[in-house]
Amino acid sequence: MDESIAKLKEAIRNKKVLLFVGSGISCSVGLPSWSELITKLADQLGIDKDLYEMLGDNLSLAEYYEICQSELDPAVIPAQFICDYIKGKEAEQKDRITSARVLQQIVNLDCPIIYTTNYDHCLELAHAKQKKMCKAICDVKNMASVCERDTQIIKFHGDYDHPQSIVFSESSYFDRLDFESPLDIKLRADMLGRSILFIGYSLSDINIRLLTYKLDKLWKKNEALYGISKDERPDSYIFMAKPNYIQEKIFESRKIIPIVGNSIDCNKSTSDFLKIINPKLCN
């Protein structure tokens, strides 16, 4: 484990890490979980939340909501309610977000490219708090206006300011499996020569299952395109705030090195890890 930490730390020092930030980071500052969002969708449809949750998984329930909203008004963007709800919760928690130690530590890693499957602006707010320039990217137009000095925050599943970009229903997830969207092509290029670090994810999160599948496919495509051997693939890591030997085994089978936290408090565990891997700090 010490060897993995040392290699990861060196990769961060050399700006050779793609950081993926998951929903666990946003939830730690009071933003809604998927379960809370599903409850709100049930409320919108006038369905008992317990019954709603019994009738399908999160993606199929979101799909049902999208179908119902489209039938009521085809002009409505189904994800608009989700976007508005998250935006409102973010406004309520702004002080907590801008003072969150974990978010400050993420910014202080100085990773030039951060991917996130979150729709919120926590990362943008954290960069602004520390007066560090960043550019959120959720479509081709954003890519054209990136300055080299800016940290790129790739909104891989959309941004609440752009409801049409949001990936939240079953069909929208399936659409992203084609691997040929502009963001997929960018990811394929960004992966070359870089390690990947996931934080804020667990196997119960559909995003990590999709991402690990997608990344494996993209690596195989890169290997074919550029003649890269499997041995030349940089290491990928996932931080797990709590030990879970089943999840660890699954991640290892997907060529992702699990690094397990040492505290029962998930937030403290994540903070301790981010401190250890920051090459600017003496640990």
Q: What function would you assign to each model-found segment?
A:
Residues 1-3, 96-97, 136-138, 177-181:
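Short gly/ser/thr-rich secondary-structure transition/capping motifs
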Residues 1-19, 25-29, 40, 44, ...:
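SIR2/sirtuin-family catalytic core signature
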Residues 1-107, 112-115, 123-129:
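Gly/serine-rich nucleotide phosphate-binding loop at the start of the catalytic core
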Residues 33, 100, 168-170, 244:
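Residue-level signal for threonine
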Residues 121-122, 161:
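A short acidic, glycine/proline-enriched capping/turn motif at secondary-structure boundaries
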Residues 151-173:
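Active-site-proximal helix-loop elements at catalytic-domain edges
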Residues 168-185:
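Active-site glycine-rich loop that binds ribose-phosphate moieties when present
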